[in-house]
Amino acid sequence: MAKNITVDNFEKEVLQAAGPVLVDFWATWCGPCRMQGPAVEKLAEEGYNVGKINVDDEGEIAERYHVMNIPTLIIFKNGEEKERMVGVQSKDLLESKLKALA
């Protein structure tokens, strides 16, 4: 299951994580976000480091990373943003980007 990322654990779970971390910025009311959810959860089940940030609850993080549209998926590595995708993405595409940064 993807980790729920908050302002309290963002530093530890994302910025200080070993290896790449896929972060899904989403909201409960967002239809495309609900479509993206299963692919993100499947990657987490397969052992990839995946977190989800609810932009309504954690607006500070979304603002810090200039997330203007959702879903936005950002891959971080070594505390830095390495890849950003806006809109629904396939599991295969996300997995290939995570593998490339491993």
Predicted regions: what is each one?
Residues 6, 26, 51:
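Conserved Rossmann-like nucleotide-binding pocket used by diverse enzymes
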Residues 18-21, 25-29, 69:
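Short pre-active-site segment immediately N-terminal to redox-active cysteine/selenocysteine motifs
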Residues 32-46:
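Typically the conserved alpha-helix immediately C-terminal to a functionally engaged Cys/Sec
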Residues 77-102:
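Non-catalytic, surface beta->alpha helical segment in thiol-disulfide oxidoreductase systems
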